[in-house]
Amino acid sequence: MNGFNVRNENNFNSWKIKIQSAPRFESVFDLATDRQRCTPDEVKNNSLWSKYMFPKPFAPTTLKSYKSRFIKIVYCSVDDVHLEDMSYSLDKEFDSIENQTLLIDPQELCRRMLELRSVTKETLQLTINFYTNMMNLPEYKIPRMVMLPRDKELKNIREKEKNLMLKNVIDTILNFINDKIKMLNSDYVHDRGLIRGAIVFCIMLGTGMRINEARQLSVDDLNVLIKRGKLHSDTINLKRKRSRNNTLNNIKMKPLELAREIYSRNPTILQISKNTSTPFKDFRRLLEESGVEMERPRSNMIRHYLSSNLYNSGVPLQKVAKLMNHESSASTKHYLNKYNIGLDETSSEEENNNDDDDAQHNRNSSGSSGESLLYYRNE
């Protein structure tokens, strides 16, 4: 091994291109991916049903994750002495995977992965699982009592997030959009990202949609949402929704009206590539330009904010789940009160003293949820 750490992020970025462009990459990746399938024994060992088995296709997001893990595994399989030789052939590594002949054991893979970059225990375990399935090895578990540096770092960030006043953050961004972005001209390339970010932010805040869902809406869609309070669409794709006809809801009126005002002056600005990180870059820039300081800004904090506010104001959990387009209310539970959302928007300071009792009473009353939702729509 070299006296210095040659296995690092910069070195990996160079190798990543080389690995992906290797002639055997796709065929060996397909083989490795197919080995992740877990066919039940009652099918695999049944003389009748085994001949009718079919490979269930992996979701695009799953394949994307698998490809990322596969590239890192190939990179970590290359010995240190070869890492500075970009003319090195990867045949040895691809042969190893194809023939399931071991070059490094799971623990050595862990060591090299940690040398490459700081990762969470969960990410590392998922990569190891992919590796052991791919190489037909016994299961390897990272010891329970282990906490990696990245886990400690994220734990500290989460502690800070609990004290983050989300309402103040959202109000700061809305004020910035109203004061600075609303009248910007999209003819200037530098301003386009801010305009896109502002429109998508307002749509997310008004509907509870995810960032890649919100950018699919047109000006006409916003008009329908504002006028009718609902939108039925067979063209807008929602995460984990198999239905061809999805329903979107107007949860907060004012952000949608602000989105429409900006969007109607720039009707083609959200026409960007389908598979791009641009919306996330726009979101981060919007926060930076607004003066909001967050260690780990995430677009789904808006969904957390809306879910918590709706639930705390008395909307039943099942109704909140429906508004968030969750298939199960169990998913919505993870959203509730993760952040300090700030003063309850439906209560005065005096009423906040009885907040918990009132909210529970409202959840037990079928009429209250409708009133709560109407309040949000008028905002």
Swiss-Prot record:
What top-level branch of life does the organism fall under? Viruses
UniProt keyword Transcription, yes or no:
yes
Where composition is biased (Acidic residues), the residues are 346-358
Q: Which Pfam families match?
A: Phage_integrase
Report the active site residues. 210, 239, 303, 326, 335
Recorded GO molecular functions are: DNA binding
Its biological purpose is as follows: Plays a role in nucleocapsid assembly and serves an essential function during the final stages of the DNA packaging process. Participates in the processing of branched DNA molecules at the late stages of viral genome replication.
In its UniProt entry, what is this protein called? Very late expression factor 1
Q: Which gene encodes it?
A: VLF-1
